[in-house]
Amino acid sequence: MAVPKKRTSISKKIIRNTLWKKKGYFTALKAFSLAQSLFTGNSKSFFCNKYKR
């Protein structure tokens, strides 16, 4: 039968949680930055139609 290993320390848990949260923060920041550049029309890496007909 499988036996659980030693308990993960609180500090390790906090470090992992912080890294996980930072990852989400930077992803959201990138998405917001792209949305801003699309809105202002300064985007050089994303192609979209500027005019609606």
Curated annotation (Swiss-Prot):
InterPro entries: Ribosomal_bL32 (IPR002677), Ribosomal_bL32_plant/cyanobact (IPR044958). GO terms for molecular function: structural constituent of ribosome. Transmembrane segments: none annotated. One of its GO terms (biological process) is translation. Coiled coil: none annotated. Keywords: Chloroplast, Plastid, Ribonucleoprotein, Ribosomal protein. GO terms for cellular component: chloroplast; large ribosomal subunit. It is found in: Plastid, Chloroplast. It holds the Pfam family Ribosomal_L32p. Belongs to the bacterial ribosomal protein bL32 family. HAMAP family: Ribosomal_bL32. PANTHER family: 50S RIBOSOMAL PROTEIN L32, CHLOROPLASTIC (PTHR36083), LARGE RIBOSOMAL SUBUNIT PROTEIN BL32C (PTHR36083:SF1). This is Large ribosomal subunit protein bL32c. It comes from Phaseolus vulgaris (Kidney bean). The gene is rpl32.
